[in-house]
Amino acid sequence: MAKTIVIKQIGSPIRRPAKQRATLIGLGLNKMHKTRELEDTPSVRGMINSIPHMVEIVEEKG
């Protein structure tokens, strides 16, 4: 089974650059305090690291 990571949106995309909004959409987040469980891959980690002020890692599984 692949490793997974649970992330939660903690920041609003209002008044943020379009690239940051697009990154949130790419992660599947669009509303405050929503969570998603994603595969723990380098590309997902890179997206999370590009917007650390808007998302937090809730849990790492696997």
UniProtKB/Swiss-Prot annotation:
The keyword Coiled coil does not apply. GO terms for biological process: translation. It comes from the Bacteria. Keywords: Ribonucleoprotein, Ribosomal protein. The keyword Ribonucleoprotein applies. One of its GO terms (cellular component) is cytosolic large ribosomal subunit. GO terms for molecular function: structural constituent of ribosome. Belongs to the universal ribosomal protein uL30 family. Part of the 50S ribosomal subunit. This is Large ribosomal subunit protein uL30.
